[in-house]
């Protein structure tokens, strides 16, 4: 079993139950899924750019990404409906805990001038969104193989009913929030 999931079941669930006075173990918030999304605006001009982004996302997550397509046409961006413009991966189960563990312990500390992640990125329903400016912070990405530095969005979806519960859950899981 994953280290983070083991910690969640043995330490975090009892701690959250006592802090928020839950009656049942099923009320305790847990991480439902993690969605990693990267937008590739250059894909409209050059289709090969998208292939490298998909390959990098697959290396980072260990799962094949889904190519996202444009929902509507925007003439100013020379974009037609149905054109491929990005890639996303939805992680659940073991891979989700593996990715979160790697993100918190290895990748985020590698960010330059890192002082913690923002506390304001909760959406009001207990979900947390984190923007990563460059894919180079992940250990799987080789610096010499990167054609262009790309960012990505990491959305952590929880079953928490409020931001306070979600914040406490992520803090217990080791997410380094700003002081």
UniProtKB/Swiss-Prot annotation:
Tell me which InterPro entries the record gives. Ribosomal_uL5 (IPR002132), Ribosomal_uL5_bac-type (IPR020930), Ribosomal_uL5_C (IPR031309), Ribosomal_uL5_CS (IPR020929), Ribosomal_uL5_dom_sf (IPR022803), Ribosomal_uL5_N (IPR031310)
Q: Which UniProt keywords apply?
A: Ribonucleoprotein, Ribosomal protein, RNA-binding, rRNA-binding, tRNA-binding
The regions listed as transmembrane in this protein's record are none
Query: Is the Endoplasmic reticulum keyword given for this protein?
Result: no
Gene Ontology CC: one annotated term: cytosolic large ribosomal subunit
Q: Span of the secretion signal? A: none
What is an annotated GO biological process for this record, any one? translation
- Its family? Belongs to the universal ribosomal protein uL5 family.
Q: What job does the chain carry out?
A: This is one of the proteins that bind and probably mediate the attachment of the 5S RNA into the large ribosomal subunit, where it forms part of the central protuberance. In the 70S ribosome it contacts protein S13 of the 30S subunit (bridge B1b), connecting the 2 subunits; this bridge is implicated in subunit movement. Contacts the P site tRNA; the 5S rRNA and some of its associated proteins might help stabilize positioning of ribosome-bound tRNAs.
User: What does the subunit comment say?
Assistant: Part of the 50S ribosomal subunit; part of the 5S rRNA/L5/L18/L25 subcomplex. Contacts the 5S rRNA and the P site tRNA. Forms a bridge to the 30S subunit in the 70S ribosome.
Name of this protein: Large ribosomal subunit protein uL5
Q: Which gene encodes it?
A: rplE
């Amino acid at each position: 079993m994953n280290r983070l999931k083991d910690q969640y079941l043995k330490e975090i669930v009892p701690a959250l139950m006592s802090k928020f006075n839950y009656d049942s173990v099923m009320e305790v918030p847990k991480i439902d899924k993690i969605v990693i999304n990267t937008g590739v605006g250059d894909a409209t001009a050059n289709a090969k750019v998208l292939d490298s982004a998909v390959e990098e996302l697959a290396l980072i997550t260990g799962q094949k990404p889904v190519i996202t397509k444009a929902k509507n046409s925007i003439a100013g961006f020379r974009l037609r409906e149905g054109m491929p413009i990005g890639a996303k991966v939805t992680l659940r189960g073991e891979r989700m805990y593996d990715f979160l563990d790697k993100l918190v312990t290895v990748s985020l500390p590698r960010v330059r001038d890192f002082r913690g992640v923002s506390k304001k990125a909760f959406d009001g329903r207990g979900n947390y969104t984190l923007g990563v400016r460059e894919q180079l912070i992940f250990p799987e990405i080789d610096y010499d193989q990167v054609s262009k530095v790309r960012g990505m969005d990491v959305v952590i979806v929880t079953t928490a009913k409020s931001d306070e519960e979600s914040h406490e859950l992520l803090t217990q899981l080791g997410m380094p929030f700003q002081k």
